[in-house]
Amino acid sequence: MSDDFAESVTEANAESDTETAADAESSAAEDASAADDAAPEESTGDEQAGETTAESSDAESVTVSERVAEYDDELAAEVEALEARVADLEASVADLETERDEAEETASDLESRLKRTQADFQNYKKRAKKRQQQIKERATEDFVERVVTVRDNLVRALDQDEDADIRDGIESTLKEFDRILEDENVEIIDPEPGTDVDPTRHEVMMRVESDQPADTIADVFQPGYEMAEKVIRAAQVTVSKE
């Protein structure tokens, strides 16, 4: 009886172990099936996450491209503006250079005109001074011509009148005339007989018989006058014949 009971217990335990093993296998199969079912869901989630990341990356790429394009446009606009500014500045520089050249040309022309005007003025001053000197000299010459005529008359009066009272007065007057002529730098041309004739200072009136050498001055008919090396009146002389 004990052996039967032991066998029964053994069989019962074996059956129990069999059932337990079967249950374990069944549970494992179910877990495997559940895992298979869960795997597609996890794969789908990964794919969705990948798609989201790709979309985000594409969006970021588009945004960067747009920003780069906008920056390029802004840079191009700035470059265009700078080029326009440079063109304006170059035009301004060209205008200023033209104005400078015109100003330099005007200044050169004015300088030339000023030099010509100064030269003309200096020439005018010289001509005016020379003219004034000529007028002064001419006036002095006229005065001297009138004075020497009076002097000649006084000399003749001395030669003809021997009255002592009158002679003293005439001589005094003649000395006064000579002083005036000397103040005006007037010299008397009164050559000595026997000297050579100077055509620039002597006027030959005639040839006469004389004890002087031939072709020399025989006598002075009327003295001459010169002022500042200019002959006012030539001395009138006679020349000895051969």
From Swiss-Prot:
Domain of life where this protein originates: Archaea
Pfam families assigned: GrpE
Ranges of biased composition (kind: Low complexity): 23-37
Assigned GO CC terms: cytoplasm
Subcellular compartments: Cytoplasm
Biased composition (Polar residues): 50-64
SUPFAM superfamilies: Coiled-coil domain of nucleotide exchange factor GrpE, Head domain of nucleotide exchange factor GrpE
Region annotation Disordered: where it falls in the sequence: 1-75, 93-136
PROSITE patterns the record matches: GRPE
UniProt xrefs under InterPro entries: GrpE (IPR000740), GrpE_coiled_coil (IPR013805), GrpE_head (IPR009012)
Composition bias type Acidic residues, residue spans: 38-49, 96-108
Keyword check for Chaperone: yes
Basic residues bias (residue ranges): 124-133
Keyword set includes Lipid metabolism: no
Entry keywords, A to Z: Chaperone, Cytoplasm, Stress response
GO molecular function: adenyl-nucleotide exchange factor activity; protein homodimerization activity; protein-folding chaperone binding; unfolded protein binding
Record-stated family: Belongs to the GrpE family.
Function as written in the Swiss-Prot or TrEMBL entry: Participates actively in the response to hyperosmotic and heat shock by preventing the aggregation of stress-denatured proteins, in association with DnaK and GrpE. It is the nucleotide exchange factor for DnaK and may function as a thermosensor. Unfolded proteins bind initially to DnaJ; upon interaction with the DnaJ-bound protein, DnaK hydrolyzes its bound ATP, resulting in the formation of a stable complex. GrpE releases ADP from DnaK; ATP binding to DnaK triggers the release of the substrate protein, thus completing the reaction cycle.
Subunit record text: Homodimer.
Protein name: Protein GrpE
Native source organism of the sequence: Haloferax mediterranei (strain ATCC 33500 / DSM 1411 / JCM 8866 / NBRC 14739 / NCIMB 2177 / R-4)
